[in-house]
Amino acid sequence: MNHHSPERRLIELRMEHADLDATIDRLAEAPSADELLLRRLKKRRLMLRDQLSKLELALDPKEPA
């Protein structure tokens, strides 16, 4: 697997998504949570989830080739 392969990108996106999950959870528990920051992070997480879904579908299509 090279540094620019779709599989590598998938791993990177999953890692970034997991990091965002942890950050969002930690910030949400804070008593003085910055709501604007939380919304931005959640929006970024959703965008990552969409990218992950598209890439997973491209790498593993349901229909046989």
Predicted regions and their residues:
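Extended, charge-rich alpha-helical interface modules
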Residues: 1-65
